[in-house]
From Swiss-Prot:
Cystine residue pairs: none
Binding site for GTP: R19, R65, T104, K178, R280, L281, R282
Stored Gene3D superfamilies: Aldolase class I (3.20.20.70)
Binding site for [4Fe-4S] cluster 2: C275, C278, C292
Protein name: GTP 3',8-cyclase
Species assigned in the record: Synechococcus sp. (strain WH7803)
Gene name tied to this protein: moaA
Keywords of this entry: 4Fe-4S, GTP-binding, Iron, Iron-sulfur, Lyase, Metal-binding, Molybdenum cofactor biosynthesis, Nucleotide-binding, S-adenosyl-L-methionine
A GO BP entry: Mo-molybdopterin cofactor biosynthetic process
């Protein structure tokens, strides 16, 4: 029997991507994310996480993104990957429909041993976040004490993590290793070309993210946003770019360098919203499901995690009722509208 078609929401968007946060804790304190220092109570157990992913795959999910906080802080990461790999190898298991399991990390804990373990456990892709290369700017963007020296140490760790991931088999050429950077005017906009230079030298796709109004702690203001168009224009003036087709459901628009030295992408939730084909559901480490990054509250899945049948009915119904289009409707919301925090949602 063929699987039932994926549910569609009120705007006819299918369910395709599950973003699962493993922890809200982080070893950095980036001001745009504002992570918590203590673990959430009531975290999902490993068996519940696997059950959730299996149900999501039965509803059409083809991509799983593991997030945080900092997911490498979670002692459940490797056991989860191993359990998912076992399911993916069984054609009769809905987990076999997973085409990609990806991880987003700040790279600080991405040692050679950890990178090899992640690859062996079945992880397909790693995205490393790095917002600057100059020590003082890095310290500001990562919320570090110790100024320039602390920032320089962090850059060394993250670049070491990138190298470790590549040696472990996460290949940039096939999309297995990418670099993320959140750009904020007046803080790290001077780092745009240095980051692009680094990515070109290492053959890694650089994804440039507009500073977003997620959460209530980061003091977001529109004049702090560097638009994707401006970022592309500045890079194109240095190294000519060629636009690439946008894939359905993708968060990013992409360009290739005319000289063949790699690609960049932009995630422009502020200036070029992509709500129209958004196919993502976010579930926090404590089992709250959010149908939009900018939502103020979620749906508690924990009462339903004991049964795949019950959980499937709840998640299907949640998706079918979904109407979120916050980024497209942003101007109609008041400045005081509450949002869940980025570190809690997992980006």
């Amino acid at each position: 029997m063929s699987p039932a078609p994926p549910p569609v929401d009120q705007w006819f968007r299918p369910f395709g991507v599950l973003r699962l946060s493993l922890t809200a804790r982080c070893n950095l304190a980036c001001p745009y994310c504002c992570p918590d220092s203590e673990e959430l109570p009531g975290l999902m157990r490993l068996d519940q996480q696997v059950r959730l992913v299996r149900v999501a795959c039965g509803l059409g999910v083809h991509t799983l993104r593991l997030t945080g906080g900092e997911p490498l802080l979670s002692d459940r990461l490797l056991p989860l990957l191993e359990a998912l790999a076992a399911g993916r190898s069984n054609a009769a298991d809905p987990l076999a429909r997973l085409q990609e399991v990806a991880l987003t990390t700040n790279g600080v804990l991405l040692t050679p041993e950890k990178a090899l373990a992640l690859r062996a456990a079945g992880l397909d892709r790693i995205t490393v976040s790095l917002d600057a290369l100059e020590g003082g700017v890095v310290a500001t963007m990562a919320g570090l004490r110790g100024g320039q020296r602390a920032g320089e140490r962090l850059v060394e760790q993250v670049l070491g993590g990138l190298s470790a991931a590549r040696r472990a088999g996460f290949e940039p050429a096939s999309g297995g290793l990418k670099l993320n950077a959140v750009m904020r005017r007046g803080l790290n906009d001077s780092q745009l070309l240095p980051l692009a230079t680094l990515a070109r030298e290492r053959g890694v796709e650089l994804r440039l993210i507009e500073y977003m109004d997620v959460g209530n702690r980061n003091g977001w203001a529109p004049d702090q946003v560097i638009s994707a168009a401006e970022m592309v224009q500045r890079i194109d003036a240095r190294w000519p770019l060629r636009p690439l087709p946008r894939e359905s459901g993708a968060t990013s628009r992409r360009w290739s360098y005319a000289d063949g030295r790699g690609r960049i992408g932009t995630i422009a939730s502020i200036t070029e919203p992509f709500c129209g084909d958004c196919n993502r559901l976010r579930v926090t480490a404590d089992g709250q499901a959010f149908t939009c990054l900018f939502a103020s509250e979620g749906t508690d899945l924990r009462p339903f995690l004991h049964s795949e049948e019950t959980l499937e009915a709840v998640v299907r119904g949640l998706w079918q009722q979904r109407r979120d289009r916050y980024s497209e409707e942003r101007q109609g919301f008041t400045a005081s509208a509450p949002h869940a925090e980025m570190a809690y949602l997992g980006g």
